[in-house]
Amino acid sequence: MIRIAIDAMGGDFGAEPIISGVIEALKEAEFKAVLVGDSNAIKPLIPQPYLKNIEFIEATEVISMSDGATDALKRKDSTIYKAVELLKEKEVDAVVSAGHSGATMSLATLRVGRLKNVSRPAIATLMPNSKETATLVLDVGANVDCRSEHLFQFAIMGEAYAKEILGRKEPKVGLLSNGEEESKGNEVSKEAFKLVSRLDSFVGNAEGNQIFDGSIDVMVCDGFMGNILLKTSEGVADAIGKIIKKQVKKSPLAMAGSVLMRKVFKTLKKQVSYDEYGGAPLLGVNGCVIISHGKSNSKAIKNAIFQAIKFANSNINKVIEEELSHFAR
C-alpha cells in the first residue's frame, strides 16, 4: 500500500483543511496517510472509521512563511523536516506539503537528494488551457537564476512527466520567450534553444499565450519568469471572476442570464481553479514531493494526494534518469 507523509500543520489555515482533504482522499483511494504534526490537535479532527488508515508522527514546530528556507535545515522537529526525513529513509513513498515551499524544496534537495545527472530540481505546475488538457509549466519558482543546461534538463523532465503522468504520447515542448523566432530571447534562452533542439519533442520558442491556447504541452522557463507567470495568471483569473460578478449585479437581465449559465460558470471555475490540480511536483529529486498552495482547501489537498499516488506508482524518476543519461557529458 502506498504510504504518503502529509505535513498536517503547514498550510495557511492550519490543520483543519488538510485533515479534511486527507479524509476525502481516503474515501476514494486506498493508501496509508502518515500525518506529521501535533497529534493532540490532529486526532480530534479525524472520524474514528478512518484512523485505521492513518499513522501519526509527532512534530512540534511549523516552518512559517516568514522563516528563511535554510532555517528548515536546523529545525529538525518541524513538520516538513520530519516528513522529508521519512521519504529519505524510504518509510513513505511520497510527501505532500502546503507549507513553506522554499523549505520543502531545500529539504527535499539536500536530504532526499537529486536524481542522477540532475543539476537542479524544478517545480512543475499545470495551467489551464482552452483545449481543456492543461499545460505543464516548469520551473515556477525553484530556481531564480538558471543556465542554459538547467533549462535543457527542465525540458527533459517536463517531457517525461507529460508522457508518464499526463499520458501525452507525443508532447510538444516549448521554450518561453518574447517571440517564436530562434533569434528571440536573452543569451541564456538562446543557448538553451540550441540544447533543447536536440529533443524531437521541441517545437521551438513559444510565447506566453501558447500556454493557454493548448498549442504546446510543456512550457520551459526559469523559476523567476515562471513564478511571475503563475502569480499573474492567478491574479487575472481572480480579477475576471470579480468583474463578472460586479457586472452581473448591475443588471436584472444579466442576473437572470447568469442563472441560466450557472452550469457554464461552474465548469469554468473548475477548469481554472488550482484546487483541481492539487499541487506541483518537485521534479528531479530522488522521490515524490508534491508542493501545494499555502491557501489549499480540502479539495486541493485531496487532489495533491491523488497526484502523489499516481507519481509514486509510476516510473517517472527512472525515465528522467534514463533520458538524461543519453545527454550526459
Swiss-Prot record:
Keywords attached to this Swiss-Prot or TrEMBL record, sorted alphabetically, are:
Cytoplasm, Lipid biosynthesis, Lipid metabolism, Phospholipid biosynthesis, Phospholipid metabolism, Transferase
Q: Which Pfam families would you find in this protein's record?
A: FA_synthesis
Q: What class of enzyme is it?
A: transferase
Identify the domain of life.
Answer: Bacteria
One Gene Ontology CC term in the entry: cytoplasm
Q: Which GO terms describe its biological process?
A: fatty acid biosynthetic process; phospholipid biosynthetic process
Q: Which HAMAP family match?
A: PlsX
* Function statement: Catalyzes the reversible formation of acyl-phosphate (acyl-PO(4)) from acyl-[acyl-carrier-protein] (acyl-ACP). This enzyme utilizes acyl-ACP as fatty acyl donor, but not acyl-CoA.
Name of the protein in its database record: Phosphate acyltransferase
In the UniProt record, the gene name given for this protein reads plsX
